[in-house]
């Protein structure tokens, strides 16, 4: 526990002392190779390298019109490269992370200038620690095959597809789509007309109003027997005849829009634009629309730019406020150009005509989250029981806050961490928090008070926040009972508590479920493991001095009920079968383990069921158990950690990074005796 306090205190002070520091998410990759100074944001003299890419979706390829932009000779990880690839898939083809997970295949191929290539699976989520030099990349090909569900195939068999063409003002569209009907379905001309109008609106943007104002609007139904029928879309008159969908060969839709003289004044001017976000550019596939009023000022133009940034790339006004760069360049047809800052409030009185604009390029380079986000460590004491500083309050955006804002944050963590809601606080005997400032002063605030404060505080001036709650009688809806777990004679200290309801009397069946739950979450012991265990029991110690031993393997429970408030503590004891002394000896494996480079603070001897065949998950479970037993770092603590990874070194010279917060589905096995050492890195 001393080590755990040392880690958390050191890291908490480190976070406060370095507000605005940029933590690299790819520290694992950076550890593998020396840092490339050319990629530093402080080195402004770098040049750019453009890597062309192509996207193929379901066999249909897109021309190489755009490039990924990197700093020249920059060393990047495969994780960073995958993020870039996913970004262009989303912006160019509308393929999201969910689409990739559900796809039949999703991969990209990196072609290097030395003739080699590397294929990366976009669905794997596993990255090597190797770095790539951007100047060595020749091109990138992205290939995605979307998954077609079995249900869709059944629908295809049951559905009947009718090809259609659309001709608007003499311009025809190729037969790329079909109208879908049920096979041998009898439909009316009214239903058919509704389908035709629907595709006119979705494919060509022609509404009912446009059809009424058009010179001509009709569609021709071509039947398989050689006959055809022409229907006027403007008439609104339908015959009572029904058509069998399987008799239709094709449908030709023809619309001539009426051009009134007054429509000349309502011309819709389209200006193409592109967005470059953090060096990744999108194709010019969209336009800014200027209708009715082609003359516009730069203030309105800036508003339109911000709107497309929000719509196309999810960049809000808040993101722009903290961006390193945020500007757009207006290129005119006469060869001139004008650069305008998106965060500026100063606009010229000049007007610009949309027809004079050739294109608009939008450039945004977002700032690091560390500059926008600030973290303040906090502790919670409920009825005198305090928690260590393992978490921080996160303040995003404005560096100044009021006590009203802090109170909202405090209420949120009380609800999340300790299950204390607004109602419990209302009836609490005491509900306060103390703000400790770096200058040595402090201020105590009542959580239940309505604070109206004119002066704002700077988050960076706050050292820590201590929350203190003493619940009243109405707030005591739950009891927290301390427990210990002993597996094969090895016990853990009392770090956690069982949360048991006080609202009603409980049974041993209810208590059994609670005990099994913590065995599963804390030590990875499932119901099946308990069934085959040599011994599985727990002892309930009551405050009146009595105790009750309960067999976890039995499904027979006494009908007695009791109150959780009468329980003093619970000791859980599980003994598992071992194969033989000979096997046990060979399954005991020793290798050094460090935590944040500290040695000999956790056990270096581990017992595996079969040391000759273990997986990464098996190793992770053993390391978590050792940290819980020796240092009191539980699975819950790891889940709240900012970073929890370990690097396993093998005797053959290879190594692998593993995230302790993730459950791996890698079924590849290896020998425990092949492990040379393990380095664990924790950041709270």
Swiss-Prot record:
Any one GO cellular component localisation term in the record: plasma membrane
Membrane topology field: Peripheral membrane protein
Cell wall biogenesis/degradation is among the record's keywords: no
Range of residues in the leader sequence: 1-30
Record keywords: Cell membrane, Membrane, Repeat, Signal
Subcellular location: Cell membrane
UniProt key word Cell membrane: yes
Superkingdom in the source lineage: Bacteria
The MAP repeat ranges on this chain: 45-154, 156-265, 266-374, 375-474, 475-584, 586-684
Role description: Binds various plasma and ECM-proteins.
UniProt name for this protein: 77 kDa membrane protein
């Amino acid at each position: 526990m001393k080590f755990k306090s040392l880690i958390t205190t050191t890291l908490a002070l480190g976070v406060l002392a370095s507000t605005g520091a940029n933590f690299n998410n790819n520290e694992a990759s950076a550890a593998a190779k020396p840092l490339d100074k050319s990629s530093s944001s402080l080195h402004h003299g770098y040049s750019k390298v453009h890597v062309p890419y192509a996207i193929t979706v379901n066999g249909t390829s897109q021309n190489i019109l755009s490039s990924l932009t990197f700093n020249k000779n920059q060393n990047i990880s495969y994780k960073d490269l995958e993020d870039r690839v996913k970004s262009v898939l989303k912006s160019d083809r509308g393929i999201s992370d969910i689409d990739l997970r559900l796809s039949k295949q999703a991969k990209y191929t990196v072609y290097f200038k030395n003739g080699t290539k590397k294929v990366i699976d976009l669905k794997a989520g596993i990255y090597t620690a190797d770095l790539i030099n951007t100047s060595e990349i020749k091109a990138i090909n992205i290939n995605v095959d979307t998954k077609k569900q079995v249900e869709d195939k059944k629908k295809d068999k049951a559905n009947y597809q009718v090809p259609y063409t659309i001709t608007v003002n003499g311009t025809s569209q190729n037969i790329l789509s079909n109208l879908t009907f049920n096979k041998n379905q009898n439909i009316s001309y009214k239903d058919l007309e509704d389908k035709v109008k629907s595709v006119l609106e979705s494919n060509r943007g022609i509404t009912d109003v446009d059809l009424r104002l058009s010179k001509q609007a009709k569609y021709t139904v071509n039947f398989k027997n050689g006959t055809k029928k022409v229907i006027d879309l403007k008439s609104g008159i339908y015959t009572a005849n029904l058509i069998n969908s399987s008799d239709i060969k094709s449908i030709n839709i023809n619309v001539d829009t009426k051009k009134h003289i007054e429509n000349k004044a309502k011309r819709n001017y389209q200006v193409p634009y592109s967005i470059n976000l953090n060096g990744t550019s999108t194709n010019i596939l969209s336009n800014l629309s200027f209708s009715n009023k082609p003359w516009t000022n730069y203030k309105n133009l800036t508003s339109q730019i911000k709107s497309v940034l929000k719509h196309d790339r999810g960049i809000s006004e808040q993101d722009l406020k903290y961006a390193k760069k945020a500007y757009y360049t207006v290129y005119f047809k006469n060869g001139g150009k004008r650069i305008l800052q998106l965060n500026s409030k100063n606009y010229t009185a000049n007007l610009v005509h949309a027809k004079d604009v050739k294109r608009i390029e939008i450039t945004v380079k977002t700032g690091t989250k560390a500059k926008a986000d600030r973290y303040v460590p906090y502790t919670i004491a409920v009825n005198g029981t305090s928690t260590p500083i393992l978490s921080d309050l996160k303040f995003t955006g404005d560096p100044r806050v009021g006590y009203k804002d802090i109170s909202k944050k405090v209420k949120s963590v009380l609800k999340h961490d300790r299950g204390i809601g607004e109602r419990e606080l209302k009836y609490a005997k005491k509900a306060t928090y103390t703000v400790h400032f770096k200058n040595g002063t402090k201020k105590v605030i009542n959580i239940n008070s309505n604070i109206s404060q004119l002066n704002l505080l700077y988050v960076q001036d706050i050292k820590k926040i201590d929350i203190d709650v003493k619940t009243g009688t109405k707030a005591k809806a739950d009891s927290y009972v301390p427990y210990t777990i002993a597996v094969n004679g090895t016990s853990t200290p009392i770090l956690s508590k069982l949360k048991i309801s006080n609202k009603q009397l409980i049974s041993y069946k209810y208590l059994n479920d609670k005990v099994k739950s913590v065995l599963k979450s804390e030590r990875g012991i499932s119901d099946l493991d308990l069934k085959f265990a040599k011994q599985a029991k727990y002892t309930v110690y009551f405050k009146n001095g009595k105790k009750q031993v309960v067999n976890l393997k039995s499904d027979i429970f006494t009908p007695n009920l009791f109150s959780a408030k009468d329980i003093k503590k619970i000791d859980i004891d599980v003994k598992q079968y071992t194969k033989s002394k000979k096997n046990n000896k060979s399954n005991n494996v020793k290798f050094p383990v460090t935590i944040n480079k500290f040695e000999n603070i956790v056990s270096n001897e581990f017992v595996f069921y079969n040391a000759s065949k273990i997986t990464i998950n098996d190793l992770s479970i053993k390391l978590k158990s050792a940290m819980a037993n020796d240092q009191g770092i539980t699975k819950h603590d790891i889940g709240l950690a900012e970073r929890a990874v370990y690097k396993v070194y093998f005797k053959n010279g290879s190594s692998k990074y593993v995230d302790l917060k993730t459950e791996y589905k890698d079924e590849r096995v290896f020998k425990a005796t092949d492990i040379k050492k393990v380095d664990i890195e924790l950041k709270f």
